[in-house]
């Protein structure tokens, strides 16, 4: 389980990216790299990291489900994810 501060930091980054998205786009198109440098560091989408929606785990993230592999396995074994079952051939 990730620390609450790490989860909060990631949410704050998402909000900052959304806030400055239009301004970043305009500055990039104009080629104003000095203006881009003056924006906050967290305004860049490169600094965002995918995290599990339930546990906040940063590694082993499955984009299709929005959760980590560990959480996915637990939920799939308990039948909590519709349409997912253990492979057998």
From Swiss-Prot:
GO terms for cellular component: cytoplasm; small ribosomal subunit. GO terms for biological process: translation. One of its GO terms (molecular function) is rRNA binding. Keywords: Ribonucleoprotein, Ribosomal protein, RNA-binding, rRNA-binding. Part of the 30S ribosomal subunit. Contacts proteins S3 and S10. PANTHER family: 30S RIBOSOMAL PROTEIN S14, SMALL RIBOSOMAL SUBUNIT PROTEIN US14M. This is Small ribosomal subunit protein uS14. It comes from Flavobacterium psychrophilum (strain ATCC 49511 / DSM 21280 / CIP 103535 / JIP02/86).
């Amino acid at each position: 389980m990730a620390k609450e501060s790490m989860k909060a930091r990631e949410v704050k980054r998402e909000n900052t990216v959304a806030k400055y998205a239009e301004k970043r786009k305009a500055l990039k198109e104009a080629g104003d790299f000095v203006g881009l440098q003056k924006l906050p560091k967290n305004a860049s989408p490169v600094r965002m990291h995918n995290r599990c929606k339930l546990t906040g785990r940063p590694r082993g993230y499955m984009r299709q489900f929005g959760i980590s592999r560990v959480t996915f396995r637990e939920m799939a074994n308990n039948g909590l994810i519709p349409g997912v079952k253990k492979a057998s051939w």
